[in-house]
Amino acid sequence: MAKKRTINELRQVKDSVYVNRNVKKSSVNFVDEVEEFNATMGKPNNYEPTIPEKKEWQFVYDFILEELEEYKHACETGNIVEVLDALCDIAYVSLGNGTMLHGLKDKIWPAYQEVQGSNMSKACTSEEEAQATVETRSKEQGEPCHYEKVGKYYIVYRTRDKKVMKNINYYRPNLLQFFTSDELSKFI
């Protein structure tokens, strides 16, 4: 029977197992670490944009759903340690495994920054802009919206659940910019 290893012994394995040290590092350290894990465990690492076979992407999809259920259970039971575990696992699987499975390692960080900029464009920079946004979004939603001043911005919320509404000057993230025409031609 194999001897059970201690946490410190397992950490030493983690620190010593670097299958491919010549791999180009990304701006997202944990994606690099998942890449190392995949290489060590014989899991796929793709380096060009791809939609792999269904069994491969379905595994990641199902794993994300499983981790979301663990997150929900941890919240329902008030277990903050399990909340942290679930959040780490969700990031590991979705941003780590998903990124490497779909060959998006070099795109994930700039794409994330583009999405962050888009999300931040939901903030109104003037009260007039907030008032116009409230009027527009209330009509679109068919229910009341309101704004609140938060720091130097005006944030428009759907009143019922305080969901942040898109500013009338919101911009959609342009994720197309991160693909070459050759990369995209494989999917059209």
Per-region residue spans from a language model:
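Flexible "arm" and connector segments at domain edges
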Residues: 2-188
